[in-house]
A protein has these predicted regions:
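Conserved active-site alpha-helix within GNAT-family acetyltransferase domains
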Residues: 42, 46, 70-89, 96, ...
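A conserved beta-strand-loop-helix scaffold within acyl/acetyltransferase catalytic domains
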Residues: 1-28, 33
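Short coil/turn segments at beta-strand junctions that form active-site/ligand-binding loops
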Residues: 5, 62, 93
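A conserved short alpha-helix in the GNAT/GCN5 acetyltransferase fold that borders
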Residues: 40, 49-57
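Conserved GNAT acetyl-CoA-binding A-motif
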Residues: 57-67
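Short acidic/polar active-site loop segments enriched in Thr and Asp
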Residues: 26, 62, 85
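A short, internal acetyl-CoA/4′-phosphopantetheine-binding micro-motif in the GNAT/acyltransferase core
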Residues: 33-40, 69
Length: 103
């Protein structure tokens, strides 16, 4: 059974971002990653994602994936800057492709 972890980022008791991870034996999948609009483009997303990645690696997960909508260029670029590489693209549910990244 996969374990799930919820990460919530706060500044002065104000929610600024969040993400979840599903943990398998030696892998993890990040989903639901978001940063509040007023905190985007200021380095918070990178800091939050790096913290999540560090925690997952400390838990022994080296194979980490995250999915992104192909039209979300800001998230796409953030994931690349954090060390993710495109593993595959797929187009279920929509006419535009999604990408699956792997760290």
């Amino acid at each position: 059974m996969n374990q799930r972890i919820q990460y919530i980022a706060m500044i002065y008791k104000k929610h600024i971002g969040m993400g979840s991870a599903s943990l398998g034996n030696d892998e993890a999948s990040i989903f639901g990653f978001e940063v509040s609009p007023q905190y985007q483009g200021k380095g918070f997303g990178r800091a939050i994602l790096k913290r999540i990645l560090t925690d997952l690696k400390n838990r022994g997960r080296e194979n980490i994936t995250i999915e992104v909508d192909s039209t979300n260029k800001n998230a796409f670029n953030l994931y690349r800057k954090c060390g993710f590489e495109v593993e595959t693209s797929f187009d279920y549910y929509r006419k535009r492709p999604d990408f699956l990244f792997q760290s």
